[in-house]
Regions:
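Enrichment for repetitive, rod-forming helical segments
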Residues: 11-14, 44, 101, 130
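Short, Lys/Arg-enriched N-terminal segments with co-localized hydrophobic residues
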Residues: 3-19
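Alpha-helical metal-binding/catalytic segments enriched in His/Glu/Asp
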Residues: 113-131
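Acidic/His- and Gly-rich active-site-bordering loop/insert found
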Residues: 20-119
Length: 131
């Protein structure tokens, strides 16, 4: 089922000539996504402790001129991006940002600096891609 949906989306992209635009945009943003992912991976924080993660995300969003809402008693943030056509349907995109209570032993250059915490779950990737 998932593969059929992917093929259908790919067909629509090719049919509308958007595949090249998608590939070009992916290439343009690759280094930024990797930079963000490495930072988030190195600074893994457990659930409800993601203060540095939230600060990083807020900073990056604000650099892009995106309004961000934060909450004094909670981690995470809400970024609101308005479309060019004005009011219309609303799309919600979200990413988890918490790490798991696991000691990283990967040996990669960007390994977690947090004792007993690492992104073995992919949340660092999800948040980076969403940025």
């Amino acid at each position: 089922m998932r593969w059929q949906l992917c093929r259908a989306v790919l067909f629509l992209l090719v049919k509308k000539g958007a595949l090249m635009n998608f590939a070009k945009r992916a290439e343009e943003t690759e280094s930024a996504i990797i930079k963000d992912r490495h930072f988030l991976h190195e600074h893994a924080e457990l659930s409800f402790e993601e203060k540095e993660t939230t600060a990083y995300l807020v900073s990056e969003l604000e650099k892009m001129g995106i309004p961000v809402q934060t909450f004094p008693d909670y981690t995470g943030c809400i970024a609101t991006i308005k479309g060019k056509k004005g009011d219309g349907p609303t799309i919600l995109r979200r990413a988890d940002i918490d790490a798991l209570p696991i000691m990283e032993e990967s040996g990669v250059d960007f390994a977690s600096r947090t004792p007993g915490g690492m992104h073995a779950c992919g949340h660092d990737c999800h948040a980076s891609i969403l940025l």
